[in-house]
Amino acid sequence: MTTKKRPVGKKKFVSFSDDDALSRTGRLPKNLPQHGSPPVYVRRTWQTIPFHLIVLSYWFIKHSNGYDVRKCTWLLVPCQVLYLALQFNPATVYGNKILKLNYALLAVSGVTCILLTIPCMLLVVLFGAPFLEMLDKTWLLSLHCCVLSYPAVYSVLNSDFKVGFFKKYFISIAVGCWISCLAIPLDWDRPWQEWPIPLVVGAQLGAMFGYTFCSQL
C-alpha cells in the first residue's frame, strides 16, 4: 500500500509586526544578503538620498554663527524624522512587504537615540576625545551622531531587531566621524578646527554616503 506524500509548503516565520500594517511589494532581489528570515533591506533609489543633509552641512559650514553645533543638532532632529517618514521607511522592505510607519515607535526610537548617546560618548572618549574639559561638546557630538542614525535605529526596532543589514549605516557615520579627526591637529589655526566641528561635518558626510550608497540594488 502506497502512501501519498504531503506537499511541503513554504516555511512559515513568526513576526512581531502587525499584518494589518503591511503592504505587498514586488519580488526580492536575487543578490540580497541574508540577515535572518525574513530578510530586510532598503531599496537603492533616489528616494533614499538625504538631500537635507547636504543643505544642512552647507548651512553649518557657510552660514551658521560660529559653527553652532547645538543649533545644527536641533535642526537635524525634525529633518531626520521627515526623512525617515517620507523617504527611508517607504524604501525599507521586510520580507516581501513594506512596513507602514509606526508613530509610537517614532517616539521610542527617539528615546533610544538619546540613551545611545551614553555608550557613543564613551566610545568617542576611548578614541581620544576630551572628557572632563569639554564634556558638553563631546555629548553634543554623540547626540548628533545618534540623531544621524535615527532612521537606522527605527528600522532595526521595526524589523524585529534585525541589525545585520542596518549596521552599515552606523559604520558609515562612525568612519566619517573618525576620518574627520585628521583635520584637528593640522597647524592651520582655523576656527573650524575646534572640537568637535570637524567630526560633526565628518559624521554628516558619512551619513550622506551611508544612506545614499549602502542600500540594496
From Swiss-Prot:
It is found in: Endoplasmic reticulum membrane. GO terms for cellular component: endoplasmic reticulum membrane. InterPro entries: GPI_biosynthesis_protein_Pig-F (IPR009580). Pathway: Glycolipid biosynthesis; glycosylphosphatidylinositol-anchor biosynthesis. The chain crosses the membrane at residues 45-61, 74-94, 111-131, 138-158, 169-189, 195-215. Keywords: Endoplasmic reticulum, GPI-anchor biosynthesis, Membrane, Transmembrane, Transmembrane helix. One of its GO terms (molecular function) is mannose-ethanolamine phosphotransferase activity. Pfam families: PIG-F (PF06699). It is a multi-pass membrane protein. Belongs to the PIGF family. This is Glycosylphosphatidylinositol anchor biosynthesis protein 11. It comes from Eremothecium gossypii (strain ATCC 10895 / CBS 109.51 / FGSC 9923 / NRRL Y-1056).
